[in-house]
């Protein structure tokens, strides 16, 4: 059986062992065959462990198509569940983790060749929708796409959202013009996509299905979990020039830096208050809204903020999770514990 190709059963003098670990592939030929066919492939199974050159090329091609289809399917699922901007940003972040220093050097060379127009004769696989530059390699293309994201902001003329890419702004603007058939049963807001409605409804129900395996924190969206997971990594490339703190994202560094400068650029349009962080302004702005869209599922109470609803729901929970550090008392809510400490232990 050693002289026969496992795939086509041809007899050839140039057969290659499918378990050969010396070949420059991230997965063995045996694993490629198993993934493409669904058959179990293992040493000593009494089948031939050899493959001919033509079948080897066919297996690599089939495996490549399978990988591409899987990656594309995952990306489209993210677009469906999270929107195009979060999906694209997640793709860029993941590629950034995978590119090594050696890969960076090769990408730089490839980028220079692309920019000089020396590679026009070769097949173009990726075209930038921002500036229409063309690239042959996915890594080069994604590296170029990041240049459009550095320091740029494209505001939506219909709402206050900002986007790092013009193409994601265009996709977002369609939501203002498109029909919004999906209505929230809690606050009557409508959405163009069912996935957006599902994410929104979690702000009412308090559901946070995406859990970090390292610290047990939970999140409403999978994109929020992915960003959080990066905080557990050892790499913290963004360093504060005023102190020794480091951060995994430039966004977090910018927020922290305002604690040194005292800058509060996010101003409320309803009152004189200003905030250092955009999310704090967003949370504050809801206090000016007349409606109280967050309704408790256990009683008739309604709230302006989802965080207030989450805190309130603890009242309906029999478990008392907040323990006083000074005595043996337990409380259902953090604010009740705080009141106890001020009144009894002050």
Swiss-Prot record:
Gene transcribed to yield this protein: Paris
Upper classification of the organism: Eukaryota, Metazoa, Ecdysozoa, Arthropoda, Hexapoda
Zinc finger (C2H2-type): 126-148, 154-176, 182-204, 210-232, 238-260, 266-288, 294-316, 322-345
Binding residue positions for Zn(2+): 5, 8, 52, 55
Subunit structure: Interacts with park.
Annotated protein name in UniProt: Zinc finger protein Paris
Cross-referenced Pfam families: zf-AD, zf-C2H2
GO molecular function term, any single one: DNA binding
Post-translational modification: Phosphorylated by Pink1 leading to ubiquitination by park.
Cellular component aspect of the GO annotation: nucleus
């Amino acid at each position: 059986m050693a002289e026969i190709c496992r795939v086509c059963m041809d007899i050839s003098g140039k057969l290659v062992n499918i378990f050969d670990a010396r070949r420059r592939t991230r997965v063995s030929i045996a694993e490629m065959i198993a993934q493409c066919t669904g058959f179990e492939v293992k040493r000593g199974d009494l089948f031939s462990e050899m493959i001919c050159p033509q079948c080897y090329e066919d297996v690599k091609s089939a495996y490549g198509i399978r990988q591409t289809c899987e990656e594309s399917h995952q990306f489209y699922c993210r677009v469906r569940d999270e929107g195009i901007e979060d999906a694209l940003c997640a793709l860029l972040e993941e590629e950034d983790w995978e590119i090594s220093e050696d890969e960076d050097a090769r990408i730089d060379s490839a980028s220079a060749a692309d920019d000089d127009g020396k590679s026009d004769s070769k097949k173009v696989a990726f075209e930038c929708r921002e500036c229409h530059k063309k690239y042959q390699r996915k890594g080069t293309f994604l590296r170029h796409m990041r240049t459009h994201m550095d320091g740029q902001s494209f505001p939506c003329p219909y709402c206050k959202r900002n986007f790092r890419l013009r193409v994601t702004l265009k996709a977002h603007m369609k939501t203002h013009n498109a029909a919004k058939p999906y209505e929230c049963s809690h606050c009557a807001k409508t959405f163009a996509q069912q996935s957006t409605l599902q994410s929104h409804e979690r702000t009412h129900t308090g559901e946070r299905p995406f859990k970090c395996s390292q610290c047990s924190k939970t999140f409403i969206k999978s994109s929020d979990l992915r960003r959080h997971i990066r905080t557990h990594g050892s790499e913290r490339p963004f360093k504060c020039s005023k102190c020794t703190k480091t951060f995994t994202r430039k966004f977090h560094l910018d927020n922290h830096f305002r604690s040194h400068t005292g800058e509060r650029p996010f101003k409320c349009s309803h009152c004189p208050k200003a905030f250092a962080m955009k999310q704090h302004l967003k949370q504050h702005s809801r206090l000016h809204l007349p409606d109280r869209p967050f309704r408790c599922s256990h009683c008739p109470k309604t709230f302006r903020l989802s965080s207030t609803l989450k805190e309130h729901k603890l009242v309906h929970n029999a478990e008392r999770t907040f323990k006083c550090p000074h005595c043996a008392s337990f409380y259902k809510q953090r604010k009740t514990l705080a009141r106890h400490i001020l009144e009894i232990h002050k």
